[in-house]
A protein has these predicted regions:
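Short catalytic/metal-binding and nucleic-acid-binding patches
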Residues: 1-152
């Protein structure tokens, strides 16, 4: 029985992980579908571009990957220390390239708006940034954002 990634990943043991993501119900990720005779080869570039983009945003390096007709293999290196070294501004900038963020985080990113924030609002932004920081070196979030983008 499959186990969730959070119970399989221990960064103290190794920062390198091999992740596999499969298509279901005879769906084709790329290549030619033998049943419908449609070509999905253009999707290979989508997957590659998304991997490169996520690798530049996350504190996760893509060491190797293979995009097969109905699944992908990705070898990842999690650089937790890099994520912990980022400033709050850097974390929010990276997160906002993928997500909208909250009203407070968007205000914080604008220098003229940041000066108007109260101390409690800034504390809230820092707490939110720490959540984002954890996500930006989490393999589950990396794979989620890769697969959701391709599925849509």
């Amino acid at each position: 029985m499959p186990r969730p990634r959070k119970s399989l990943i221990c960064l103290q043991d190794t920062p390198y992980y091999h992740c596999i993501s499969r298509c279901v119900r005879r769906a084709f990720l790329c290549g030619e579908d033998h049943y419908s005779k449609k070509s999905y080869e253009h999707r290979r570039q989508w997957v590659e571009a998304r991997l490169i983009k996520l690798g530049s945003i996350f504190a996760i390096n893509v060491c190797a990957y293979a995009v097969m007709s109905n699944h992908t293999h990705v070898v990842l290196h999690v650089d937790r220390d890099e994520a912990l070294s980022w400033t709050t501004h850097e974390v929010l900038k990276r997160w906002h390239t993928l997500h909208k963020g909250t009203n407070l985080t968007r205000q914080y990113m604008q220098a003229e708006q940041r000066s108007l924030l109260s101390d409690s609002q800034i504390e809230s932004v820092i707490a939110t940034a720490n959540i984002y920081r954890q996500r930006l070196h989490d393999i589950s979030w990396f794979m989620r954002l890769l697969n959701e983008f391709i599925a849509r």
